[in-house]
């Protein structure tokens, strides 16, 4: 093997049509070429190519060499044919730069090949610098062709490629060509998805490092048991990207469809030993993905499949692909990932989970809520209320004398306003979950919430006309009744969250029974396991998690009118407060839902993380665990550890909202529970899940091997 191998920088123009060069026409075939070529003889596209190279520090050295040789007149004519002419120059490379490694230098010749266009100017076709160890690639668009001639077509697009050919000591006489893109975004096809994680890579103390934590974790995994090839990231400006391998949103829909549990075998309401198939249509894709991140392929049972593919193979196909402007680097890492099925499953699950938990702004629902609440609320607060009361009690009536009647009148509008507003709020939650909804499904829930709001708002309305003599006592009573009114206005949310929780539990139970999800293990409390999985999933699910947090936010913001009123600080007049109640207080749930969706995109280091930052930490943990434990069985991430990354304990609004939702659901369930104790009614779905059945495998639903 030759220890001194030629390493070249190339600037090339790819063939225009079918890979075949065009025959010379016009001046190209007629004119003789000068012995020396100067800058004035170059076309505008050639100058633009050199200027584009100069814009990057890594490219500047080579562009300078070409321009200097042109200015000095050292490019001398060598040969020509029907399509191009060749010029060469002998150059002296500076000794204080690592642009060329002198120990690998073969010669110091700079070769330029050019083509004469129909304007008698030269377009650069290629340039070769022998002896360089650098490798870059560059695209430069040329100006539109003039006169439509064939020679002008050649200058429509000038493609500048600088590539290197490096020797590999491990492979006799083999050579690797690395094309480095000056800008990943510049060369990305329009249809190619943007990278999820992107970082620069450099060599440091013999290893490859990156300032991006996720990319650094990927590099650590790749070089955990094998060093990178010496030619990988051997120049500055190397970037590494993790980008989706396939259409992740489409893949998520396939995953959701495959793992939606339509029916579950539950206990009969009349006989607990009897099992009945009940429609649940339970969506369990988020807890499944969480479990796949925690345990890899071990999360699934023998019957977990998506079409003709196993769940393991499907998730592995969703793992991100690694791209780089250094082909040696990306090829090495992709080969490492390809040989690690467990890691691909976990990374694929994380890719899907990232999309599954993405919170989208719901403009339609917000506009509907503000329109209904603000318009109807303002019409009542600023006009209709006073007109109606004056018509009934006279213009100079005493509010304290008719406190109960006036409070009753004020409690009627919430029945209408909150019913319509709850429709919008539930539509927002359904939209965030990506679920279809119909008016017939939401209307009963909305009317129930409107009725609750109307009843619960009555005590607060009474205190607006007949308060306590004690200022402190009056403020305390108003605080309690105001919070009750807020909860009543949002009474459509807690039952929606509870319904999702019960259906998910039933779905997880059935998936374990059917061998889709792996059994928790012998001696493990399956009920507690399923309850924990459900809680962890709903804490990050886009619809339910945002709904719960919105309850916490509404309970705080909803107190502003009371605090600013003359019952407390007196900061705002009653007229202003009426407008505030109409514009903000009434549609507070819809505003909170969308504000929280947008807030998930904000990242403030040290205070709170964006959703993207949380998922990046999960990817980093998956890769770090793989680096520490090359065996798949030792890489498990605990459920609590993963939950802490995605739903930190510091999420104040989640804790407040959860307490409110659980408390409201308990109060809603109090009377039905009492009725059931008297022997009437059917037990709720959550109480009819036969967790004890999971102790015995259900072989009747499992296919024969």
From Swiss-Prot:
GO terms for cellular component: extracellular region. InterPro entries: Plant_immune_effector. One of its GO terms (biological process) is symbiont-mediated perturbation of host programmed cell death. Keywords: Hypersensitive response elicitation, Secreted, Virulence. Effector protein involved in non-host recognition. The keyword Oxidoreductase does not apply. It is found in: Secreted. The keyword Secreted applies. The lineage of its organism: Bacteria, Pseudomonadati, Pseudomonadota, Gammaproteobacteria, Pseudomonadales. This is Effector protein AvrPphDPsv. Residues 1-15 have a biased composition (Polar residues). Residues 1-40, 175-205 are annotated as: Disordered.
